[in-house]
Amino acid sequence: MSIFIDRETKVCVQGITGSEGSFWTKHMIDLGTDVICGVTPGKEGQMVEGIPVYHSVKNALKHHKIDATMLFVPPKMTKDAVFEALEAGIKKIVTIADGIPLHEMMEIRQRALEENAFVVGGNTSGVISPKEAMMGSFPHWIERVYKKGSIGVMTRSGSLTNEVTAMIVEAGYGVSSLIGVGGDPVPGARFAEFLPLYQKDPETKAVVIIGELGGTMEEEVAETILKGTFTKPLVAFLGGRTAPKGQKMGHAGAIITGGKGSVQNKIEMLEKAGAKVADRPRKVGKLLEELGVTKD
């Protein structure tokens, strides 16, 4: 069972007529995603990959039931697009935009919490359940990376996602649902908020998190395990072990500040909670074996 999106999820694409939107809409459909409509202001009546385009989400809802929406819009337009979707009652939103203004991302997260909705991103590749559906920009056709299986994956990094997931597959496992929470300082939703969904999913035997220095998301995962609300095996790989304090490393969120966010502190907390931490991607599969997770 996919935890965020599956073949039954009715998906809208906001920004569908742009080059990124149209390109990835085709790949989303190719994988099996049920994309039913698109939204681009001023483009109502057009068709993209056989999908009708509407001026607004409100107009689209007059003709379609929408479960989730995928945003391919510029950073400075993201807040308005997310709020439009939330006001329409859509509870699952993915935005890949990199560089959403920090204060606007804070507003987005607060509004999503108030609406009991999930906003995945920004600065993410999105969400994918291999062989089922995706919302985002994953190279899903690479079988050695995106093979269906029983390992849930959450990640803050795009490039590390491909590397670690490839190692999971090489070790004899596959992926149930992969969620890229994004690499910005304020994501729409955090690792720990998705753990209850993986806990309830009978097809997910274990979870792998791909984290990095900065922020406190990995520490929140450790706290969730210690509280006993997540009980499945968990393995982590954390990038940035040798990064100097105060130096941003690739992502805006990958920075150690105020004595918090160091990889060493994250490792200590995760291991104290009973999770395993791999010191390199290739060891993730071995640690899953050590935790008794059966192969797919």
UniProtKB/Swiss-Prot annotation:
Higher taxonomy: Bacteria, Bacillati, Mycoplasmatota, Mollicutes, Acholeplasmatales
Pfam families: CoA_binding, Ligase_CoA
Catalytic reaction annotation: sulfoacetate + ATP + CoA = sulfoacetyl-CoA + ADP + phosphate
Subunit structure: Forms a complex with SqwK.
Keywords: Carbohydrate metabolism, Ligase, Nucleotide-binding
Cellular compartments per GO CC: succinate-CoA ligase complex (ADP-forming)
Function according to Swiss-Prot or TrEMBL: Part of a variant of the sulfo-TK pathway, a D-sulfoquinovose degradation pathway that produces sulfoacetate. Hydrolyzes sulfoacetyl-coenzyme A (sulfoacetyl-CoA) to produce sulfoacetate and CoA coupled with the phosphorylation of ADP to generate ATP. Cannot use succinate, acetate or 3-hydroxypropionate, and shows only residual activities with malonate and 3-sulfopropanoate.
Catalytic residues in the record: 251 (tele-phosphohistidine intermediate)
Annotated NCBIfam families: PRK05678.1
Name recorded for this polypeptide: ADP-forming sulfoacetate-CoA ligase subunit SqwL
Family assignment from sequence similarity: Belongs to the succinate/malate CoA ligase alpha subunit family.
InterPro entries named in the record: CoA-bd, CoA_lig_alpha, NAD(P)-bd_dom_sf, SUCC_ACL_C, Succinyl-CoA_synth-like
Highest taxon listed in the record's lineage: Bacteria
GO biological process, one term: tricarboxylic acid cycle
GO molecular function, one term: succinate-CoA ligase (ADP-forming) activity
Gene this chain is encoded by: sqwL
Keyword Ligase: yes
Amino acids binding CoA: 17-20, 43, 96-98
Enzyme Commission number(s) from the entry: 6.2.1.-
pH dependence text: Optimum pH is 7.5.
Classification via SUPFAM superfamilies: NAD(P)-binding Rossmann-fold domains, Succinyl-CoA synthetase domains
PANTHER family with a match to the protein in the record: SUCCINATE--COA LIGASE [ADP_GDP-FORMING] SUBUNIT ALPHA, MITOCHONDRIAL, SUCCINYL-COA LIGASE SUBUNIT ALPHA
Gene3D superfamilies named in the record: NAD(P)-binding Rossmann-like Domain (3.40.50.720), Succinyl-CoA synthetase domains (3.40.50.261)
